[in-house]
Amino acid sequence: KRDLNTGSGVVLGSSGSGKSTTIKGGEVIPTLLKYPDDRVIIVDPEDEYSDIGRAFGAQMVDISIGSKTHINLLDLPDLDRLAEEDDDPIGDKANLLMGLFESILSEVTDAQIGIIDRVTGQTYERYMTEDYTPTLKEWHQVLKKQPEEEAQDLALAVETYTNGSQDIFAHHTNVDLNHRFVIFNLKK
């Protein structure tokens, strides 16, 4: 994997076939011990990596309703580290939100896609400072102020994710996503 452009991997197999045991002993532990500059990121749908995470001081991120851990979807990357071709991080966030809402809502119209793009730009213009990044809560406030009926329909449709019971991505990030070892636990 060290010779590849990306060291990412996916392990597939039937239930009980030893996938987690193989990965823990053959990939995770050796990487953490032998390569101190490498990062290990695990998406853990069955809560099988919590023990090894605690043993190695991982940043544990619980992705579930009611979780105390939050990830701000509007966080921007470190602009100094962006490649020259990545010169529109706000446009990238608008595209992320378009894709997210298209996947979780039953329908997003072409007009609403345009509104998402506009609202994202306006949200950063109004709220972004050197010390503050807006959240989906502010994004939702800007959305509700838009004049179009489609914007009001969209505001109602996304309210659960911005101010309701599924607002895990609508708060300021309170976990270290730059930590060397991060486990995203999807089961809790």
Residue ranges and their predicted role:
Residues 1, 47-59, 65-67, 72-188:
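P-loop NTPase motor domains
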